[in-house]
A protein has these predicted regions:
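Class I SAM-dependent methyltransferase SAM/SAH-binding core
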Residues: 87-89, 94-144
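A short glycine-rich, Lys/Arg-flanked "PGG" loop and its adjoining helix->strand segment in the class I
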Residues: 164-176
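A short acidic, Gly/Pro-enriched loop at the edge of an enzyme's catalytic core
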Residues: 143-154
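Conserved class I S-adenosyl-L-methionine
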Residues: 176-183
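Class I SAM-dependent methyltransferase Rossmann-like catalytic core
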Residues: 49-73, 77
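A short SAM/SAH-binding and catalytic strip from SAM-dependent methyltransferases
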Residues: 153-166, 181
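N-terminal auxiliary segments of SAM/dcSAM-dependent transferases
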Residues: 1-48
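Short helix-loop-beta connector
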Residues: 80-87
Length: 183
């Protein structure tokens, strides 16, 4: 089970309809588009990552099919590595194109995967949450993931910075990291 953590105190978050709340009563509203902002309080009010135009440009580019082969290969590999009820993080999920394919591939195995998308760009996760309403999406830094230790079966890291120590912290023993980088 995914263990989201409070970026203020580190306590475990629980979802209460449209809010995530920890035992210390810190609360984080789920936006209408379906994502929650879990960036540290010191980062509030600042723009991080891609803006609306950059996200729209990436979405338009990916919709032209140039990366369909890669998207399919990533989704197929995820389905091979993870069980049908796996806890999976798309670290640096962007606007959710890969996340959608990953979810569909895992769900096709007949299970109920728990999929989390995290990106530092609130605009990107806003779009991702609309693309994959079955997932949990948060604006968060992959350098300081708001996740409990050893809570993930698989981390997917596509064209995003590698945060090796942080990824090792949140991966379960025997978990996998699927990384895609340009050659």
């Amino acid at each position: 089970m995914l263990g989201l953590l409070c970026p203020v105190c580190g306590g475990r978050l629980a979802r209460e309809k449209t809010v995530w709340r920890c035992e210390s009563r810190h609360s984080f509203d789920v936006a209408r588009s379906g994502y929650v902002n879990l960036l540290p309080p010191s980062a509030s009010g600042k723009r991080h990552g891609d803006d609306k135009r950059m996200v729209a440009a990436r979405t338009a580019f990916l919709s032209r099919g140039y990366y369909d082969h890669l998207i399919g290969a990533v989704a197929e590999t995820c389905a091979q590595l993870a069980g049908p009820d796996a806890c999976v993080l798309d670290a640096g999920c962007g606007e959710g194109t890969y996340t959608r394919a990953i979810y569909d591939a895992l769900a096709a195995k007949g299970g109920c995967p728990q999929l989390l998308g995290a990106d530092i760009s609130a605009e990107a996760v806003r779009r991702a949450a609309r693309q994959v309403p079955e997932g949990i999406f948060c604006a968060a830094s992959t350098a300081h993931l708001p996740l409990a230790a050893e809570s993930l079966d698989l981390i997917v890291n596509i064209f995003s910075p590698l945060m090796a120590e942080e990824f090792l912290r949140v991966l379960k023993p025997g978990g996998y990291l699927l990384r895609v980088v340009p050659m």
